[in-house]
Amino acid sequence: MGSESLVHVFLVSFPGQGHVNPLLRLGKRLASKGLLVTFTTPESIGKQMRKASNIGEEPSPIGDGFIRFEFFEDGWDEDEPRRQDLDQYLPQLEKVGKEVIPRMIKKNEEQNRPVSCLINNPFIPWVSDVAESLGLPSAMLWVQSCACFAAYYHYYHGLVPFPSESAMEIDVQLPCMPLLKHDEVPSFLYPTTPYPFLRRAIMGQYKNLDKPFCVLMDTFQELEHEIIEYMSKICPIKTVGPLFKNPKAPNANVRGDFMKADDCISWLDSKPPASVVYVSFGSVVYLKQDQWDEIAFGLLNSGLNFLWVMKPPHKDSGYQLLTLPEGFLEKAGDKGKVVQWSPQEQVLAHPSVACFVTHCGWNSSMEALSSGMPVVAFPQWGDQVTDAKYLVDVFKVGVRMCRGEAENKLIMRDVVEKCLLEATVGPKAAEVKENALKWKAAAEAAVAEGGSSDRNIQAFVDEVKRRSIAIQSNKSEPKPVVQNAAVADHFGAKATTNGVAADLAGSNADGKVELVA
């Protein structure tokens, strides 16, 4: 079957590495189930993706479907520094996107690829407005944990007390979740957060939460069972993770990296089993030089092999380029390897890797859990502090090295060394490894045929197909010709759209939007 005969979903991503990766993984999962998927994000990122990931012009076959890429200009010059300021960039992206995305969808329809559903990730909730204006259904992919989704939801609606300027250090008790200390709440919700623009960006999604017919989540039922069950009574949630595991297309050569990964697998091949500490703080966390130095000496003093990812900051980010202590690489010798970027999925699956020193972003957390990899938690801000709480205290797969930026504390080399050894040697290491392997098995079962996430993906695909048939049927029916305002008032919105978003929303009497399986 050619790609043009398949039901077509259109994925629109915010141009951040931590947003692109899970949405592209969702796209590959949907393609493997027999859909045509178009992935789009601004050209400034598309250029990097093409360079790093060998993305071609033709649709790539994945499982029973295809995935293709279209990128769009965001209206700013290539080197525009304002992209680093979300308060300036998000309005620009919305302004351009609301004009460009409808044109892209119209062009696809003219080329016999009519779009049946739009899917966005956080920071760009206006995509659901575009879908509504076109009479198309929309869905949203949430790229953090369900626990964090619940925290933001309760904050937005003022349902429980959160830290405030008058009560900075209060604990937060959310339904079906463990008690969160003030520094375990997503830090964007702190009254003193240095990132208020990120709080505003996240809250924007909750303003539009009534428009998507489904909220897809990169988690799985068995991992966050209680909070998923609770929030599913409020929002139309479908858990579809871990998205990076795709049984129907395990080796699909379609990636969303912005940098080409360095070759480190051959070096890992040369090391004994469970002997290497993997250190990576993701794509957006940058530590200060003095903390970098302490981590470096902690690694050396531990005597363990290590693979350390040191991603250089974007030139307009304002972060300094960090350096290693003088003579560090010479002292480490063949026991250490430093790279700018790594193929993290392969690294975490490698038998020589013993533990993962991580910032605890949700993508990295899911990859660690699903790979059976113990962690050393080094969160900094945002959802990372909440993820660290769950990794250490709930999922019990690691040890905590720090509590985040709110702690405002330099973690010394002796603490680094102690945590590394605790996670790799002795009874604690054996305990967290055993727990990690249990979560790996649960993750694999969730995405296997008939597993909880696989069933949810299939239900979503079936619903998109059902809505696609209804949309095409609606387009083929004769429409009433609206002659004047009085007639328009009589027919209402249904007369002004050639889609069926209102008819197919599936709302119940309480206004909750339900996904029909």
From Swiss-Prot:
Coiled-coil annotated spans: none
Listed EC numbers: 2.4.1.136, 2.4.1.120, 2.4.1.170, 2.4.1.177
Lineage: superkingdom: Eukaryota
Binding annotation for an anthocyanidin: H19, G382
GO annotation (BP), single: ferulate metabolic process
PROSITE patterns linked to this entry: UDPGT (PS00375)
CDD domains: GT1_Gtf-like (cd03784)
UniProt cross-references to Gene3D superfamilies, sorted A to Z: Glycogen Phosphorylase B
Binding site for UDP-alpha-D-glucose: Q344, H359, W362, N363, S364, E367, D383, Q384
Alphabetized PANTHER family for the sequence: GLUCOSYL/GLUCURONOSYL TRANSFERASES, UDP-GLYCOSYLTRANSFERASE 84A1
Protein role: Glucosyltransferase that catalyzes the formation of 1-O-beta-D-glucose esters with hydroxybenzoic acids and cinnamic acid including its derivatives as preferred glucosyl acceptors. Has significant activity with gallic acid (3,4,5-trihydroxybenzoic acid), 3,4-dihydroxybenzoic acid, 4-hydroxybenzoic acid, cinnamic acid, sinapic acid, coumaric acid, caffeic acid and ferulic acid in vitro.
Protein name: Gallate 1-beta-glucosyltransferase 84A24
Naturally occurring in which organism (per UniProt): Punica granatum (Pomegranate)
